[in-house]
């Protein structure tokens, strides 16, 4: 049973480690979702197997509300699981994970609602479901069909837990800032103790003070830098991908500042999709040139 936000994370990590997942660390770049981590987005391509789980801090500048909204944040946490090939009983495994954190599926209204997923900037989409817990969406299930505009050879199953929403239900609180993060040497530390000031200040920056001209220039810089890295005799797809992620964040900031029109928005999305596709192709070729090393290890274990 998870009594704190910290407990919730640790229980999920322990559960998925027991299922054979490698527990890794988040990518140290501002991203809008756990899917953007290269261990999900890039390794979903090709034949190499994956069983990975991690917490990913996520930023969506337009979702900020100056700390005045009880359940809407510009910075929040996801718990991400990626399994390739996707196990046939992935839903049962997921439901068992809910039991481990203190949610009994027989005592709660848990529904799988069809909701196919798409990330336009990453050129990715998949078939999937939202998981609703007593009327509130808490998880997204996705079976990847395409990433970076490339077809996935093997379908990967992705599970994305919304940690704050799950924790609010477990702790029976209506305001995210009232969540107990952990019980330390000086008593309970709340989510608000750690993040409320950050939400207020980051919302103020995102909506009011971020320099739109600087953001436009940064977008152009990271786009050119990614193109340069991909044009090398020996391309560097991973550094290029990091440039793409930085360009995506600048794009999200431009949206928060209302600095681009609807037509311009579509042009920026197309530029990002074009870049991501080039990165995906270069990454696939680089893994192929290495002989898809994770496939070799998988065969040895078998």
Curated annotation (Swiss-Prot):
Pfam families: tRNA-synt_2e (PF02091). Keywords: Aminoacyl-tRNA synthetase, ATP-binding, Cytoplasm, Ligase, Nucleotide-binding, Protein biosynthesis. It comes from the Bacteria. It catalyses: tRNA(Gly) + glycine + ATP = glycyl-tRNA(Gly) + AMP + diphosphate. One of its GO terms (biological process) is glycyl-tRNA aminoacylation. One of its GO terms (cellular component) is cytosol. GO terms for molecular function: ATP binding; glycine-tRNA ligase activity. PROSITE patterns: AA_TRNA_LIGASE_II_GLYAB. Its EC number is 6.1.1.14. CDD domains: GlyRS_alpha_core. Transmembrane segments: none annotated. It is an enzyme of class 6 (ligase). It is found in: Cytoplasm. Gene3D superfamilies: Bira Bifunctional Protein, Domain 2, Class II aaRS and biotin synthetases, domain 2. Its main location: cytoplasm. NCBIfam families: glyQ, PRK09348.1. Belongs to the class-II aminoacyl-tRNA synthetase family. Tetramer of two alpha and two beta subunits. This is Glycine--tRNA ligase alpha subunit. It comes from Baumannia cicadellinicola subsp. Homalodisca coagulata.
């Amino acid at each position: 049973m998870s009594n704190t936000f910290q407990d919730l994370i640790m229980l999920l990590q322990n559960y998925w480690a027991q299922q054979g997942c490698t527990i890794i660390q988040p990518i140290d770049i501002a991203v809008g979702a756990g899917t953007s981590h290269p261990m999900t987005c890039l390794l979903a391509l090709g034949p190499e197997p994956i069983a990975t789980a991690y917490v990913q801090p996520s930023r969506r500048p337009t979702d900020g509300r100056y700390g005045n909204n009880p359940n809407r944040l510009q910075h929040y946490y996801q718990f991400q699981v990626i399994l390739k090939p996707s196990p046939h009983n992935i839903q049962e495994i997921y439901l068992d994970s809910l039991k481990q954190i203190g949610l009994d599926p027989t005592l709660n209204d848990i529904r799988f609602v069809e909701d196919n997923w798409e990330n336009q900037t990453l050129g990715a989409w998949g078939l999937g479901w939202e998981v609703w817990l007593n009327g509130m969406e808490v998880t997204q299930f996705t079976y990847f069909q395409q990433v970076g505009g490339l077809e996935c050879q093997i379908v990967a199953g992705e599970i994305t837990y919304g940690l704050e929403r799950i924790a609010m239900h477990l702790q029976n609180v209506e305001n995210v800032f009232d969540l107990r993060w952990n019980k330390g040497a000086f008593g309970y530390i709340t989510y608000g103790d750690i993040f409320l000031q950050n939400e207020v200040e980051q919302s103020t920056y995102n909506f009011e003070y971020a320099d739109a001209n600087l953001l436009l220039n940064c977008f152009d810089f990271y786009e050119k830098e990614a193109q340069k890295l991909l044009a090398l005799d020996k391309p560097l797809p991973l550094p290029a991908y990091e440039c793409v992620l930085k360009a995506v964040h600048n794009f999200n900031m431009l949206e928060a500042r209302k600095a681009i029109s609807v037509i311009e928005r579509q042009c920026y999305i197309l530029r990002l999709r074009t870049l991501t596709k080039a990165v995906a192709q270069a990454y696939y070729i680089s893994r192929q040139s290495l002989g898809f090393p994770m496939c070799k290890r998988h065969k040895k274990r078998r």
